[in-house]
UniProtKB/Swiss-Prot annotation:
<protein>
    <recommendedName>
        <fullName>Cytochrome c biogenesis protein CcsB</fullName>
    </recommendedName>
</protein>
<dbReference type="GO" id="GO:0031676">
    <property type="term" value="C:plasma membrane-derived thylakoid membrane"/>
</dbReference>
<keyword id="KW-0812">Transmembrane</keyword>
<feature type="transmembrane region" description="Helical">
    <location>
        <begin position="72"/>
        <end position="92"/>
    </location>
</feature>
<dbReference type="InterPro" id="IPR023494">
    <property type="entry name" value="Cyt_c_bgen_Ccs1/CcsB/ResB"/>
</dbReference>
<keyword id="KW-0201">Cytochrome c-type biogenesis</keyword>
<dbReference type="Pfam" id="PF05140">
    <property type="entry name" value="ResB"/>
</dbReference>
<feature type="transmembrane region" description="Helical">
    <location>
        <begin position="14"/>
        <end position="34"/>
    </location>
</feature>
<keyword id="KW-0472">Membrane</keyword>
<comment type="function">
    <text>Required during biogenesis of c-type cytochromes (cytochrome c6 and cytochrome f) at the step of heme attachment.</text>
</comment>
<dbReference type="InterPro" id="IPR007816">
    <property type="entry name" value="ResB-like_domain"/>
</dbReference>
<dbReference type="GO" id="GO:0017004">
    <property type="term" value="P:cytochrome complex assembly"/>
</dbReference>
<feature type="transmembrane region" description="Helical">
    <location>
        <begin position="162"/>
        <end position="182"/>
    </location>
</feature>
<comment type="similarity">
    <text>Belongs to the Ccs1/CcsB family.</text>
</comment>
<keyword id="KW-1133">Transmembrane helix</keyword>
<comment type="subunit">
    <text>May interact with CcsA.</text>
</comment>
<keyword id="KW-0793">Thylakoid</keyword>
Length: 428
């Protein structure tokens, strides 16, 4: 029993909870640094030759479950342990403290007043119901009072005592919601060309919806660096009687019937070429060996002797580079520019077709996450409200009225109010 009590004491301590929060923050940071959810081969190929931090190779990453941190056993155990710590702290400290603050504390002799933060006393005449007058004054000033025969207990701002408990509940909901989301959330990345669409099916309601990419554009800085990606999407559903257009941007996702659509990436998927008076739409693939965000395709050109040429592009505005695979010498093609003669073939660029990379995510934990944030913010705000307490004692033998006050926050502000009240009581 003693061992169990000591264990609860350690688990419910602030130091233990802070240690867990720091550990979760560090591991979450590692999770943003190490790609999550890829195949075992990916980690072996990428980290065996260049270990993370100099010692974490692919095998160690897999063994330590760093490839799926947020669903790993040790990470979930840490979340559960933090929930237990916060719950233990709430039951051991916050709830007893709240219960104690609900009780009216009696200060029925002058010796007790010396222990308070603020005290004052005034002589009174023998006649007059001073207790009732003070009680009425305090109620007018917004104080909750409890009147005894010879003394009064008063308090204000008790809601501030609830704040830490609300924050703890919010953190617990956040942790449980995050753990729930790591198992139940689903995401799918799709690349859509303008005019293309995809169907969404909600199995729980047996309803269907269609998302169509109306337009995709890229805003660039003056030096050509991408500034913003913008997808204009049409949402339609006969089952839900919906037909509306919404815009997705980076950091500005679209929320639709429990789904969140993020603007995540882009690509140049197709180019339209006119080769010897015939139009061809060629599909491009990313070529990381050449450079970051470079797309291309290998084509045969020539009216008599066919030769391979590599077409590459890295910008939705062009140019398209045509390179001879033998010596990689080449020329640039611009949209609607005059045709180039390549190996006796006339080639012109008619159109560049970029595609929008969208991540469609279904995360049932989002309402829990938002609710937890509301609780945490609300709890933090009301925690700032000071809890003030007053005691008034009338000693009929010495004909003296004593006033004492206590505040857990903003003692300077409470001190001004205390002595103002003291002067009003003195003038009775």
């Amino acid at each position: 029993m003693i061992i169990f009590k000591n264990l609860i004491l350690k688990i419910s301590s602030l130091r233990f909870a802070i240690s867990l929060i720091i550990f979760i923050a560090i591991t979450s940071g590692i999770g943003t640094f190490i790609p999550q959810g890829n195949s075992n081969k990916f980690y072996i190929d990428n980290f065996d030759s260049a270990p993370i931090f100099g010692f974490l190779d692919g095998e160690k990453v897999l063994k330590l479950q760093l490839d799926h941190i947020y669903t790993s056993i040790w990470f979930l155990f840490t979340l559960i342990l933090l929930c237990i710590s916060l719950s233990a702290c709430s039951f051991r400290r916050q709830i007893p403290s709240l219960k104690a603050s609900l009780k009216w504390i009696e200060y029925n002799n002058e010796k007790k007043f010396s222990k308070l933060q603020l005290t004052s006393s005034h002589p009174i005449n023998q006649d007059g119901d001073h207790i009732s007058k003070v009680d009425l004054l305090l109620k007018k000033r917004g104080w909750k009072t409890y009147k005894f025969k010879s003394h009064i207990s008063a308090r204000r701002g008790l809601i501030g005592k609830i704040g830490p408990l609300v924050v703890h509940i919010g953190l617990i909901v956040l942790l449980l919601g995050s753990a729930y989301g790591s198992f139940t959330s689903q995401s799918n990345e799709q690349y859509l060309l303008p005019g293309e669409s995809l169907d969404l099916v909600n199995e729980s309601t047996n309803s269907k919806a269609n998302i169509k990419l109306v337009n995709f554009s890229i805003e660039r800085e003056s030096d050509g660096i991408p500034k913003q990606f913008i997808s204009k999407l049409n949402f339609s559903s006969e089952d839900l009687n919906i037909n509306e257009i919404k815009t997705a941007k980076v950091n500005h996702p679209i929320r639709f019937k429990g789904l969140t659509i993020y603007q995540a990436d882009w690509a140049i998927s197709n180019v339209v070429l006119e080769i010897d008076n015939i139009l061809y739409q060629l599909q491009l693939k990313e070529i990381p060996e050449i450079g970051n965000q470079v797309w291309g395709v290998l084509v045969e050109l020539g009216s008599e002797t066919k030769k391979n040429f590599l077409l590459t592009i890295d910008n939705e505005n062009g140019p398209l580079k045509i390179s001879n695979v033998e010596n990689f010498s080449g020329n640039n093609l611009y949209i609607n520019d005059r045709p180039l003669e390549v190996n006796s073939s006339k080639v012109s660029l008619k159109k560049i077709i970029p595609s929008s990379g969208l991540i469609i995510k279904n995360d049932p934990s989002i309402p829990f996450i938002y609710f937890s944030f509301i609780l945490i913010i609300f709890g933090t705000i009301i925690s700032l409200i000071p809890t003030n307490q007053l005691w008034i004692f009338v000693n009929k033998e010495s004909h003296k009225l004593s006033i004492g006050g206590l505040s857990n926050k903003n003692l300077v502000g409470f001190k001004k109010e205390f002595f103002k009240l003291s002067e009003e009581i003195k003038n009775f």
